[in-house]
Each structure stands twice: as structure tokens, then as C-alpha cells.
Amino acid sequence: MSEFLPFSRPAMGVEELAAVKEVLESGWITTGPKNQALEQAFCQLTGNQHAIAVSSATAGMHITLMALEIGKGDEVITPSLTWVSTLNMISLLGATPVMVDVDRDTLMVTPEAIESAITPRTKAIIPVHYAGAPADIDAIRAIGERYGIAVIEDAAHAVGTYYKGRHIGAKGTAIFSFHAIKNITCAEGGLIVTDNENLARQLRMLKFHGLGVDAYDRQTWGRAPQAEVLTPGYKYNLTDINAAIALTQLAKLEHLNTRRREIAQQYQQALAALPFQPLSLPAWPHVHAWHLFIIRVDEQRCGISRDALMEALKERGIGTGLHFRAAHTQKYYRERCPTLSLPNTEWNSERICSLPLFPDMTTADADRVITALQQLAGQ
């Protein structure tokens, strides 16, 4: 059998090793100059005013919700078709996640679904830029402005995604992920961008014990060594080891995403003759980052179920992913929302399958996946 082809693999090279070596030899390995450089680089990439690096996108979501004073009695609108960390953070703060449906073919949450879910208790809206494509963020942001509700963009899939000529996160507040399977990675990490100066100040405190300054800030600016707690906070800072890797990856972003796009185009061309249905692309002008390439496997149409297809691909040495099982079908949320019905979400959650897609894949790797799909179609 051929070597196992994973669903994803980080694209690491000698540059990342050199970046880590530089940090280790510098004597400053925790939050410091590399964090500052990463934050500045993301302000430049997105065009936004403030950037706050954190230990994960989940941490970023947690402190953003906290900074917006979301808590007991509040509601936060989010698609169910998302990673459960968003709903977990909402729930842990005592608020209620209000899960809404998505468009059947793009899997994007729609402005109409969001607006129909708004109540007097709605405190925030969290749209997801799904799989590397952008949601209709202008329309969603307009709803937030009309009702006076905060919009927090889940941009975990969207490093390199553009909407109407502007990078995701160009305005408002957005949260990016540097997890191992993301378009750029530092193993674990995340970053928040915002144009709200007061929010940025609160996020910096909340990510580091509630202190007004961190250790590097005190050393660099000669501020008093006895930092004062201004509010209870967390330990969500990113180390400079991680930040150095993320910076190195960011310098490669165009190359990495170009390769992802090439593989996606190879899949798209082949799938035109197969019963497996890829996602539709959004109608608005955009640049797709191709974080994921997803097909829908409808048993009646394809002659094989999604789960059977994934198992058959595994037997052929090909890995796959599932992004995502609908959150409202998970035990904790199912018990709390037993009557919730989201038809488009449920239909897709039972059929979606993420194919291998990462920059170090070869054309032959993609051909191998395509050949397997051709063999399995109609079985």
C-alpha cells in the first residue's frame, strides 16, 4: 500500500527551525518582540488597527466575550455548523448560544437567519467564514449596527481570505487561528484584530492575569516591576517561540495558499464528472483561502454513505475530516435544545467530508484521492 496520505499536515521547513533557534538563543522565549512583530504584521495584513496574539482562537473567543460583558441571561447567535469551542465559551460564561441554520450549499450563516433569531437578550453575533470563504460580512455587520449588537467574526479558517477586495478582519473584530491544520500554524495559537481601542486594551489585560502590562512591556519601557491587577484575567499569552513560527509561516502565506488553490482546482475539475457535491462558492467578490475542500456524500445520489466512503478511503490509505458535526446534535447541547430543527445544517452534517488538502500535497497525491473517489462512486 502507498504511504498514508493524511487529511492535513503542517508545511514546516528550515525557516521555521531557524526562527525557533533564534528565539531560543535570544534569551527571551515567552511573550516578547516576536509577539509584537506578529501583531504588527496582522495589522498590516488586515488593515485593522489593533492585534492581540493569544494562545489559541478559543482563548481569543473567551476573552472577547468576557470583554463584551456577555454573561447570564444574554444570548449569542452562532451557526450550529461550527467547532464547538465557540458554543462552549458562550455557555461557560452563563450565556445561551442561539444556533441558527446555514445556507444549504455554501454552509455560510445568512443575514436572514441571524436577523430572525434576534431577541431583546441578544448580545453578540458570531458568523463563521467557513472553509476559507467569506460570509456576507457587510450585510451581517449592518444588522449588528442596526440593532446595536456586537459582531465577532470567527476567522479561524480565513487567513488569506478576502471579501470585496479587503482581507477578512479589515474592520470590526475578528479572531484567527494558528492551529496545526490551519493555513498558517505555530502548533497552537490565535490572534484577535479589532478597531475598538477600549476593547483591545481590555483584551490585553484579560489575556495576561488582568495586568495592565506584561513582563516584556515592563522591561522594554522601564515601567514599575510591581504590575497591578486591574481585573481578574487569564494566562492566554502566546510565547515568542510560537510567534516566531507564525511569523515565518505568514511570510509564506501567498505561496501556501496558492498551492492550496491549485489542489482545490484539481479536485473541482475531477468532481464535475462525479456524484460527490462540492460546496458552492459565495456569490459576492472574494478570494478563497481554501482551508478545507469539502464534498457532500448523499447515499442516494452517490451509491455510498459518507461514513462508508470515509472508511473506504482510510482502507486505501487516505485520510479525511469532518467539519463539522452540528453542535446541536452533541449530547450537551442536544439535551438543552431537544426540539431545535436546522434542516440545512442537519442535511450537510450527515454528508460532509473534508478531503486531503495541504500545501505539501503533490499533484500525484490529489490524483490518488480522485482515483479512489472514481472507484467508489456508485458502489
Curated annotation (Swiss-Prot):
Q: What is its EC number?
A: 2.6.1.87
Which residues carry the post-translational modification N6-(pyridoxal phosphate)lysine, per the record?
A: K182
Q: Name one GO cellular component term.
A: membrane
Q: Report if keyword Transferase is assigned.
A: yes
Instruction: Give a GO molecular function annotation for the protein.
Output: pyridoxal phosphate binding
InterPro entries (alphabetical): ArnB_NH2Trfase, DegT/StrS_aminotransferase, PyrdxlP-dep_Trfase, PyrdxlP-dep_Trfase_major, PyrdxlP-dep_Trfase_small
Query: Which coenzymes or cofactors are required?
Result: pyridoxal 5'-phosphate
Recite the UniProt keywords alphabetically: Aminotransferase, Antibiotic resistance, Lipid A biosynthesis, Lipid biosynthesis, Lipid metabolism, Lipopolysaccharide biosynthesis, Pyridoxal phosphate, Transferase
Q: Per the record, what are the reactions this protein catalyses?
A: UDP-4-amino-4-deoxy-beta-L-arabinose + 2-oxoglutarate = UDP-beta-L-threo-pentopyranos-4-ulose + L-glutamate
**What's its top-level EC category?**
transferase
Pathway(s) this gene product operates in, as recorded in its UniProt entry = Nucleotide-sugar biosynthesis; UDP-4-deoxy-4-formamido-beta-L-arabinose biosynthesis; UDP-4-deoxy-4-formamido-beta-L-arabinose from UDP-alpha-D-glucuronate: step 2/3; Bacterial outer membrane biogenesis; lipopolysaccharide biosynthesis
Q: Which processes are annotated in GO (biological process)?
A: lipid A biosynthetic process; lipopolysaccharide biosynthetic process; response to antibiotic
Which family does the record assign?
A: Belongs to the DegT/DnrJ/EryC1 family. ArnB subfamily.
Q: Which HAMAP family match?
A: ArnB_transfer
What is known about its subunit structure?
Homodimer.
**By its UniProt entry, which NCBIfam families does this protein fall under?**
PRK11658.1
State what protein this is by name. UDP-4-amino-4-deoxy-L-arabinose--oxoglutarate aminotransferase
Task: Write down the species.
Answer: Escherichia coli O7:K1 (strain IAI39 / ExPEC)
Taxonomic classification, please?
Answer: Bacteria, Pseudomonadati, Pseudomonadota, Gammaproteobacteria, Enterobacterales
What is the primary gene name for this protein? arnB
